[in-house]
C-alpha cells in the first residue's frame, strides 16, 4: 500500500485545491494517500480491516474501521473524497450512510476507474449531491458536487437473504456470493466429511455459508470465522444466528488477529482486492497456515484452477493433494507434518 493507485493519481492533480480542506476519505481505499495528502485535516473510514491496518499506523484514531460510519467518524469534515468500489450496492450503502451524516454544503468528490462503473455515481447521487465530471485520466473519472440534501439511511434495508439446502444465509452489499452460493464454495463443501470433530477456522468467511453447512453435518466441530470485510463479519454473525450455530466471528487480515491452532483451516480465498488482481491473501493464508495448524491438521482451500497455488503449497507443506476439481476450480488439501516449514 505504498504506490498510489490510478484513482489517487487523478486526485493528486487537484492537490492544491485540497490543502485547506478537512477531508473524510472513504470507499475503496487501496493506498495511503489519505495519510499523505497535504490537507487541513484528514480522516478515513473503511469497511476493510487490512486497509484500516495500514492507515491507522499513520493516522491513529483518525482512521476508523466499521460496517456503519457514525457522526464521530465524520466530525468537522467539510469534504468527502469517496473511492468508488467495483460493487454498486456497496457504494450505495456507504454513500447513503456517509451523506446522511455530513452537513449540507459538504464538497463531494467521487473518483474511480471507468471499468468499475464510477459513472453511475451521477445517477445515484442526483437527488442529494448533483455531480459533474471534472477530470478524466489514467482510465479514471473524477466527479464533483456539493451536498444539497441528506438522504435517510437505514442499514437494515440493505440486508439480503437466500437459502441453501434448507440453511438461511444472510448477506450485505460487498459480501462475496451475496446473491447465492458460488460454484467454488459448492465444490469445497462437497469434500467436507460428515461427523468431523475438532477446531475449524474459516478464513475469509464471507456470509458464513461454508461454516453453517459444515456444522450441520458435523455438529461437534468448534468453529472460528474471520474476514477482512466488516460486512462479511456482520453477515456471518447473522447467518450463524439464523441457523442456531455458535461461533466466534471477528475481523482479521488473514491470520493477523487469529490466536491458537486448529485441526482444520478452510477457505475460498479471494484473488481480487477491489478492482486489482491480488494473490497476496491466498499466499499469506497458505504460508501462515502452518503456524495455526495442529500436528496432523489440514488446510483445505478451493481456488480457480489457473491460479499458481500448487507451488506455494508444496514449498510450505512439502506436498499437496487435489481432492476435487472441475474445469474451473480445484480443491487443494495439505497436511501439517514435520516437513512443513514454520518459517
UniProtKB/Swiss-Prot annotation:
Record-level GO cellular component terms: cytoplasm
Gene Ontology molecular functions: 16S rRNA (guanine(1207)-N(2))-methyltransferase activity; nucleic acid binding
UniProt name for this protein: Ribosomal RNA small subunit methyltransferase C
SUPFAM superfamilies reported for this sequence: S-adenosyl-L-methionine-dependent methyltransferases
Main location class: cytoplasm
Species name: Shigella flexneri serotype 5b (strain 8401)
HAMAP family according to UniProt: 16SrRNA_methyltr_C
Transmembrane stretches, start-end: none
Domain of life: Bacteria
Purpose: Specifically methylates the guanine in position 1207 of 16S rRNA in the 30S particle.
Localization (cell): Cytoplasm
E.C. designation(s): 2.1.1.172
Keyword annotations from UniProtKB, A to Z: Cytoplasm, Methyltransferase, rRNA processing, S-adenosyl-L-methionine, Transferase
Alphabetized InterPro entries for the sequence: DNA_methylase_N6_adenine_CS (IPR002052), Mtase_sm_N (IPR013675), rRNA_ssu_MeTfrase_C (IPR023543), RsmC/RlmG (IPR046977), SAM-dependent_MTases_sf (IPR029063), Small_mtfrase_dom (IPR007848)
Catalytic activity: guanosine(1207) in 16S rRNA + S-adenosyl-L-methionine = N(2)-methylguanosine(1207) in 16S rRNA + S-adenosyl-L-homocysteine + H(+)
The family this protein is said to belong to: Belongs to the methyltransferase superfamily. RsmC family.
